[in-house]
Design a protein with these regions (language model features):
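Radical SAM enzyme [4Fe-4S]-AdoMet core and its adjacent flexible, acidic
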Residues: 1-18, 23, 81-82, 121, ...
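Short, charged, surface-exposed secondary-structure boundary motifs
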Residues: 137, 159-162
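Cys/His-rich zinc-coordinating "finger/knuckle" motifs
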Residues: 66-67, 71-74, 283, 300, ...
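Conserved alpha-helical substructure of the radical SAM core
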Residues: 3, 7-140, 145, 341, ...
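Flexible mid-to-C-terminal extensions adjoining Fe-S/redox cofactors in radical SAM and related proteins
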Residues: 4-5, 10, 48, 290-366
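Short, P/G- and charge-enriched loop/turn segments at secondary-structure junctions
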Residues: 39-43, 267-271, 314
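The −1 position to Zn-ligating cysteines in a subset of zinc-ribbon hairpins
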Residues: 59, 63, 275, 324-327
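Conserved residues at the C-terminal ends of beta-strands
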Residues: 70, 101, 152, 220, ...
Length: 366
């Protein structure tokens, strides 16, 4: 293991323009994460988190077709995690990155204090938002290398507005993105793909957001939430893999700022046979610590992070063992697997980072 870690570090430091971890994140953040990973591996820690998924509320100002997070009565939608509960979750978990999701986090009146507290702890914060409130609330935050606004855009204007079931949202989000970038904020795009999208459409979208000047783009097929309002919009796993192969073919030489590890992109293209690592992205919300992951909402909750790790029957979950997981390729489950693979096989990860995913030939077994 020590040999692999040394190789991993050498690959990272000797080739900063083709990073092992990803292309859409500053080197300082990558090195912080790499050091954290090395500490866990050298310490013999079996299960450790990479990203804390913090959901301080479920209330949202949109009702998206593919969302399974807002199907609750008002008494639940009106609940909030306090500043203290949010910071305690970060302390319990210890992950170097915190993704604040929801619901719409900017509806939380005390969110600026949550963000300040996380940054004071040295956490890299991704504040997820549909951007409808971003222009109004932007001055509540200060530009920082530790803060990124992660704006939800599921494609170009017509596609995104249809996805969120409201006209005009795309244009308002783009205006907010441009304003945030002009003020010096880090901005990321979070894009989910659904049925009916062509490779050409997605490539055009990625070209557009690159021109906007965003730092990175996270992209994945939509997870088939049981509570989503529409159930016919999700993509089967094999179709997702072929879609990504075709997208990546169109992206040759374009240097899209995809905010993913090289091996996760290779997985999306059907070249890696991965099982998910749900404890890599644990979720804390108003109910507690969600079992087993951010996406499955009916599996129960733990009172503490320690209880989540020790009492969750992890063997019950995965694409090969649980029908609910059958078509999942979400980065919240598989990015941690890809990063762990890169730690053990740094030369393979480096090769894929240099050459890109294989886009033809047989796919890995599912």
């Amino acid at each position: 293991m020590v040999k692999q870690l040394i190789q991993y570090r050498c690959c990272l430091e000797s080739n900063p323009t083709q990073e092992i971890l990803n292309m859409g994140v500053p080197l300082r953040q990558q090195i912080t994460v790499a050091k954290y990973l090395m500490k866990q591996k050298l310490g013999g820690v079996k299960r450790y988190p990479l990203v804390l998924m913090l959901e301080p509320l479920f209330r949202c100002n949109l009702a998206c077709a593919g969302c399974g997070k807002i199907d609750y009565p008002d008494e639940i939608l009106n609940r909030r995690l306090s500043v203290e509960e949010c910071l305690q979750a970060a302390d319990e978990c210890g992950a170097p990155i915190v993704s604040i999701a929801g619901g719409e986090p900017l509806l939380h009146r005390e969110l600026p204090q949550v963000v300040d507290g996380l940054i004071a702890r040295g956490k890299y914060v991704y504040l997820c938002t549909n951007a409808l409130l971003l222009k109004k609330r932007m001055d509540d935050y200060k530009p920082s290398p530790y803060l990124t606004f992660s704006v939800h855009l599921d494609g170009n204007r017509d596609r995104h507005d249809a996805s969120v079931c409201q006209d005009g949202v795309f244009d308002r989000a783009v205006e907010a993105i441009e304003q945030a970038i002009a003020k010096g904020f880090r901005v990321n795009i979070n894009c989910t793909l659904f049925q009916g999208e062509s490779p050409e459409e997605v490539a055009e979208f990625l070209d557009r957001v690159k021109k906007l000047g965003v730092e990175g783009v996270t992209i994945a097929p939509g997870f088939s939430y049981e509570h989503a309002p529409q159930q016919d919009i999700f993509i089967k796993m094999r179709d997702s893999k072929q879609l990504f192969r075709n997208i990546f073919k169109l992206g040759k030489g374009k240097k899209w700022p995809l905010n993913h590890s090289s091996l996760y992109l290779d997985f999306l293209a059907g070249n890696q046979n991965y099982q998910c690592t749900p404890w890599g992205n644990p979720t804390r919300n108003v109910f507690g610590w969600q079992k087993p992951c951010y996406l499955l909402v009916d599996e129960g909750y733990a009172k503490t992070f320690k209880e989540l790790l020790e009492d969750t029957p992890w063997e019950k979950y995965g694409t090969s063992t649980n029908p609910k997981c059958a078509n999942c390729m979400a980065h919240c489950g598989f990015e941690a697997t890809a990063v762990d693979d890169a730690m053990h096989n740094p030369l393979k990860a480096g090769w894929v980072a240099l050459r890109g995913p294989r886009l033809s030939g047989a796919m890995a077994s599912e």
